[in-house]
Amino acid sequence: MELAIILIIGFAILGVIIYFSMRAHNKMVSEGQIISRRTNFMENAEEFTLVLADPDQVTQAVNALDYHAIHTEMKASSQQQIFQFKGSSWTAQLRRLKEDRNQTLYRFEFTNWKTHNGMAQDALNMNRLTTAIEKAFLALDPDTQVRSVPLEFKTRHSIL
């Protein structure tokens, strides 16, 4: 009988935790802080094709992001259009791939991330950064085309 009561209380607590987690997630989605994504979204690069982008405007847009709120550091090489991002357990990069005719192609990808039980440890801030970068490109050119490209990556397993 005591075990049944403990299990009921445990499931009730778990239900409350899940409820508040989903509520917080839905609030961030409605506020535009994140986009609902698959749990393995970091395994894809995002490519942004936009009308000939002025590198200075891209640099300004990337510099204007609120990195403090995303718990992220950013280092930029404005001339080469390479931006490095570092979170608590991950790194990412945004760079200009090519510019031809009237289009510029940028690629954003996570280059390294740690997992726990198969899930990215800091997926929330990874999602926040991805969303912020997508919004920055759409603000520069509302007709920006966004394409997801699967990454080729290697996994290292820790014994401990």
Feature roles, as predicted:
Residues 11-19:
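Alpha-helical transmembrane segments
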Residues 18, 23-46, 54-160:
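Ser/Thr-rich, low-complexity intrinsically disordered terminal regions
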